[in-house]
């Protein structure tokens, strides 16, 4: 589920680097995106916490998409790239279109663009990241990171459905100083989704992470299976300001199996050894997972070897000398740099489907925080009845506006 053999280890020399995005694909640098996400965060301990989000495990229904996201999508000029079709684990395009062409630039065909993060600069810099969390083994991994004082040196690309079903694990990662990023809502092949479905997969995951992390807006995302093309890139960056993160080497830890013809812990560790104990000095951005005990075991075995061989371990943002979040600098306790206003908090009660709402209770609790993080004002609460679907609720958090987005697009 979490990988496929056509995306095995990528050689630097085999990867086709395409030109940077045409400027016309992206939203204007002075565009106001602050209205995309604005609302107070729900309490993850509350019994109705899950009702604030789409159901986990599948792509959110387009009816759940806030209108502000769709309005922003409508302003983004997208490249002329068709929606792909899943074909035995490899997305294919209609009319015999070549996924490696620069117009499409699918990473499935080992093509990436200049704006993608692929291999970190600097000698012996390991950009440490883990996909697919939080899972049952995540707390053990987070303990190991903390014991080795490297919690803040890891980026966790989290799945939205996992976030809302295991919010306490996310909070542990946040408290320890982990860097949080987006791995979509349900781990689909993104190039096979419509534009609106891509928006839903990314936006709701950003929403869930920001709600738990003090309004900090994720700045990075990694496509499941590495499945991204120029259409999906343009939506991610044009609508949400997200930077696409890929990898220069696949550890294949996701493929570990007891079957004799599959990868084993020993074989994955042997390949890992060639990366961190050999003569390589160029930076590493590996595909690794917090998926099960095997993936955690591989990392815990290889990390000491890397350190002993002079590797410097950093999270993705630090490895590329970039800030952690769209609206905050470095760390989970750094000041949120844009003005933030918590709007109406609406509790949705699902009825017969995961995307319809029969009734809602709205509690308004507005507050304003200045650039120094000082609370300026708060408003009283009120309750009222409503029958809004999720898509019509006020947005949930403040995303970085013009200057923040411009900074990452330079």
Swiss-Prot record:
Membrane topology category: Lipid-anchor; GPI-anchor
GO molecular function term, any single one: metal ion binding
Propeptide: 19-39, 386-410
Superkingdom assignment: Eukaryota
Reactions that this protein is recorded to catalyse: [(1->4)-N-acetyl-beta-D-glucosaminyl](n) + n H2O = chitosan + n acetate
Limits of the NodB homology domain: 124-314
Swiss-Prot/TrEMBL keywords: Carbohydrate metabolism, Cell membrane, Cell wall biogenesis/degradation, Chitin degradation, Chitin-binding, Cleavage on pair of basic residues, Cobalt, Glycoprotein, GPI-anchor, Hydrolase, Lipoprotein, Membrane, Metal-binding, Polysaccharide degradation, Signal
Lipid linkage positions (GPI-anchor amidated serine): 385
GO cellular component, one term: plasma membrane
Subcellular location: Cell membrane
Catalytic residues in the record: 131, 289
Residue positions binding Co(2+): 132, 183, 187
EC number: 3.5.1.41
Residues engaged in binding acetate: 131, 225
InterPro entries associated with the record: Glyco_hydro/deAcase_b/a-brl (IPR011330), NODB_dom (IPR002509), Polysacc_deacetylase_ArnD (IPR050248)
One annotated GO biological process: fungal-type cell wall biogenesis
Cofactor(s) this protein cannot do without: Co(2+)
Main location (coarse class): membrane
Residues annotated as glycosylated: 61, 80, 149, 279, 293
Record keyword Cell membrane present: yes
Signal peptide: 1-18
Keyword Signal carried by entry: yes
Reported function: Hydrolyzes the N-acetamido groups of N-acetyl-D-glucosamine residues in chitin to form chitosan and acetate. Chitosan is required to anchor melanin to the cell wall, for maintenance of cell wall integrity, and for proper cytokinesis. Chitosan offers an advantage during infection as it is less readily detected than chitin by host immunosurveillance mechanisms.
Membership in a protein family: Belongs to the polysaccharide deacetylase family.
Record's protein name: Chitin deacetylase 3
């Amino acid at each position: 589920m979490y990988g496929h053999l056509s995306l095995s280890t990528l050689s630097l020399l085999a990867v086709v680097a395409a030109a940077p995005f045409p400027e016309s694909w992206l939203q204007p640098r002075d565009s106001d995106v602050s209205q995309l996400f604005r609302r107070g965060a729900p309490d993850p301990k509350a019994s109705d916490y899950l009702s604030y989000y789409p159901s986990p495990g599948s792509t959110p229904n387009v009816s759940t998409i806030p209108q502000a996201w769709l309005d922003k999508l409508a302003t983004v000029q997208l490249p002329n790239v068709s929606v792909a079709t899943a074909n035995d684990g490899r997305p294919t395009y209609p009319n015999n279109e070549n996924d490696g062409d620069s117009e499409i630039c699918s990473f499935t065909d080992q093509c990436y663009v200049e704006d993608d993060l692929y291999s970190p600069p600097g000698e012996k810099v390991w950009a440490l990241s883990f996909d697919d969390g939080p899972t049952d083994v995540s707390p053990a991994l987070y303990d190991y990171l903390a014991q080795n004082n490297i919690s803040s040196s890891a980026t966790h690309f989290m799945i939205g459905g996992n976030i809302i079903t295991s919010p306490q694990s996310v909070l542990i990662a946040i408290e320890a100083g982990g860097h949080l990023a987006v791995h979509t809502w349900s781990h689909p092949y993104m190039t096979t989704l419509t534009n609106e479905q891509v928006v839903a997969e990314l936006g709701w995951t950003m929403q869930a992470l920001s709600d738990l992390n003090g309004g900090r807006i994720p700045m990075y995302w990694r496509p499941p299976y590495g499945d991204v093309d120029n259409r999906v890139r343009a939506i991610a960056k044009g609508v949400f300001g997200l930077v696409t993160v890929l990898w220069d080497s696949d550890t294949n830890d996701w493929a570990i199996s007891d079957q004799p013809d599959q990868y084993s812990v020993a074989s994955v560790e042997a390949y890992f050894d060639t990366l961190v104990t050999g003569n390589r000095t160029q930076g590493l951005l590996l595909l690794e997972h917090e998926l099960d005990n095997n993936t955690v075991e591989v990392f815990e075995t290889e990390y000491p070897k890397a350190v002993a061989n002079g590797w410097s371990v950093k999270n993705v943002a630090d490895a590329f000398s970039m800030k952690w979040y769209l609206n905050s600098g470095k760390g989970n306790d750094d000041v949120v740099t844009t003005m933030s206003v918590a709007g109406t908090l609406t509790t949705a009660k699902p009825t017969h489907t995961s995307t319809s709402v029969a009734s809602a209770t709205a509690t308004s609790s507005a507050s304003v925080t200045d650039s120094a993080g000082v609370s300026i004002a708060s408003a009283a609460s009120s309750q009222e009845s409503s029958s809004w679907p999720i898509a019509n609720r006020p947005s949930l958090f403040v995303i970085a506006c013009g200057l923040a987005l411009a900074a990452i697009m330079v």
